[in-house]
Amino acid sequence: MKVTLPDFRRAGVLVVGDVMLDRYWYGPTSRISPEAPVPVVKVDTIEERPGGAANVAMNIASLGAVARLVGLTGIDDAARALICKLSEVRVRCDFVSVPTHPTITKLRVLSRNQQLIRLDFEEGFDGVDPTPIFERIQLALPQIGALVLSDYAKGALNSVQPMIQLARKANVPVLIDPKGSDFERYRGATLLTPNLSEFEAVVGRCKNEEELVNRGMQLVADFELSALLVTRSEQGMTLLQLGKPPLHLPTQAKEVFDVTGAGDTVIGVLAAALAAGNSLEESCFLANAAAGVVVGKLGTSTVSPIELENAIRGRAETGFGVMDEQQLKIAVAQARQRGEKVVMTNGIFDILHAGHVSYLANARKLGDRLIVAVNSDASTKRLKGEKRPVNPLEQRMVVLGALEAVDWVVPFEEDTPQRLIADILPDLLVKGGDYKPHEIAGSEEVWAAGGEVKVLNFEDGVSTTNIIQSIKNGRG
């Protein structure tokens, strides 16, 4: 299926559901507590991220779409933290504050990229009057192209049928991430997105693909759904619609670090794509690609348009290929969250030859990700003369980005990449040739940050200058 990204800026989506705050405490562990046989974590980093329905809204906003969020919170620090974090990414919050209940909060303690324990702070919102939520939905319907109901069984969606009816009356598609085995509650929805275990809790264990499809189709008919999307972890996802053959989308995940919030990403991207004008099949394709990206990150995460674009071009995970500096910083930060070692090198790379390819492959072996910073055309002319470069910057970067050894390619305008290196601060700075480490641009900054600097040899007798001269001699 060939799919291009829509203009997400024209999409408006309302998310209604169980909002929560995800807290993360990070730190090293080096000993066992004398009080009990448990590790001692010396916490050095604390993060707060919107979770649950709030993470769905974050995923929608990260694509550039207009995201509105309705949910139940307490009147406490967690609610204020949620509003602050969501406003930073332009999610429009319209929470119903319940003074008698705390905002749902989940605290995770992690060390060396491993989750050690999760602590939940919640009472749920059962018994809370849903009328204010109905009123907020009614007001938002004229301005949205899709309604997402994100159900974590915490109380915000206890009265879900009136919400479905309001949306269907306004001809707005209703997408639901369900919870529990009572799918009767979701009758008449446009689409349900259960994972495989949630699906089998309703229809029973499926022995094979045929059984899954048949039982899924029956579920669509029984509950008057327009479609059902079953997310199946490493087996991808399957879209079922009456009167149409099943659409199976294989997983695009290359590495799985954390599945936290992956379902939020799927329904968020799917809703944004539908609201932007994509078909259901195209929207599922994009959601599947986004899921392949987000499981390669640690914790509840979102997907940017550049990451999604790279994923549907076949380069998933954190986003690969040619990037600007801001995109590169995001990609590097995500790589570091996963504990990956980042290597960086630079050059003109005017006519890519065997020496370049060998050098870049050797540089990549020294870490997990390789950044190649490339001199702009103006920078190259200043260094090499008016007749250079032979190949313009765009072509040089595309060729470099196609190499298996290269993860990220970024241009720079200055004569040296010192400023860029100081901004990125790679774990290892590499340069080819006869340099001494202290002569390499950016070496002082990398050392000061605790990184390494290394010189690699180029293949003897192979250079761009020699190739150009040989071409000239051949023409002579």
UniProtKB/Swiss-Prot annotation:
GO terms for molecular function: ATP binding; heptose 7-phosphate kinase activity; heptose-1-phosphate adenylyltransferase activity; phosphotransferase activity, alcohol group as acceptor. Pathway: Nucleotide-sugar biosynthesis; ADP-L-glycero-beta-D-manno-heptose biosynthesis; ADP-L-glycero-beta-D-manno-heptose from D-glycero-beta-D-manno-heptose 7-phosphate: step 1/4; Nucleotide-sugar biosynthesis; ADP-L-glycero-beta-D-manno-heptose biosynthesis; ADP-L-glycero-beta-D-manno-heptose from D-glycero-beta-D-manno-heptose 7-phosphate: step 3/4. NCBIfam families: cyt_tran_rel, PRK11316.1, rfaE_dom_I, rfaE_dom_II. Keywords: ATP-binding, Carbohydrate metabolism, Kinase, Multifunctional enzyme, Nucleotide-binding, Nucleotidyltransferase, Transferase. Catalyzes the ADP transfer from ATP to D-glycero-beta-D-manno-heptose 1-phosphate, yielding ADP-D-glycero-beta-D-manno-heptose. GO terms for biological process: ADP-L-glycero-beta-D-manno-heptose biosynthetic process. Residues 344-476 are annotated as: Cytidylyltransferase. The active site is at 264. This is Bifunctional protein HldE. Homodimer. Signal peptide: none annotated. Its EC number is 2.7.1.167, 2.7.7.70. GO terms for cellular component: cytosol. In the N-terminal section; belongs to the carbohydrate kinase PfkB family. Residues 1-318 are annotated as: Ribokinase. PROSITE patterns: PFKB_KINASES_1. SUPFAM superfamilies: Nucleotidylyl transferase, Ribokinase-like. The lineage of its organism: Bacteria, Pseudomonadati, Pseudomonadota, Gammaproteobacteria, Enterobacterales. ATP binds at residues 195-198. It catalyses: D-glycero-beta-D-manno-heptose 7-phosphate + ATP = D-glycero-beta-D-manno-heptose 1,7-bisphosphate + ADP + H(+); D-glycero-beta-D-manno-heptose 1-phosphate + ATP + H(+) = ADP-D-glycero-beta-D-manno-heptose + diphosphate.
